[in-house]
Amino acid sequence: KTRRGKVTMFNPDKGFGFIRDLDSGESIFAHVTNMKEQVEQGDKVTFEVEQSHKGPSAIKVTIVK
């Protein structure tokens, strides 16, 4: 299921950040390897969630133009 969110934090040096799901309000971990393009804090994005051993993780992260 595709979700809508906003990037609340992204650290380009470390290659990860967090996305706030606009519907549930939940904060989801996002790694640069799962982004179609590099995001910045404040970007609106679409994404999907997969469960990893560390909890939910955003995949297929795409900026909404």
Predicted features, each with a name:
Residues 2, 40-41, 62-65:
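OB/S1-fold single-stranded nucleic-acid-binding modules
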Residues 1-12, 44:
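Structural detector for short beta-strands of small beta-barrel domains
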Residues 35-46:
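Short nucleic-acid-contacting surface segments enriched for D/E, G, S/T with interspersed K/R
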Residues 25-37:
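Beta-strand/loop nucleic-acid-binding surfaces
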Residues 50-65:
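OB-fold/S1-family single-stranded nucleic acid-binding modules
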Residues 14-19:
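Short aromatic-glycine-enriched beta-strand elements
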Residues 9, 21, 34, 60-63:
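A residue-level detector for short acidic-glycine micro-motifs
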Residues 2, 25-27, 56:
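Short, mixed charged/polar active-site loops
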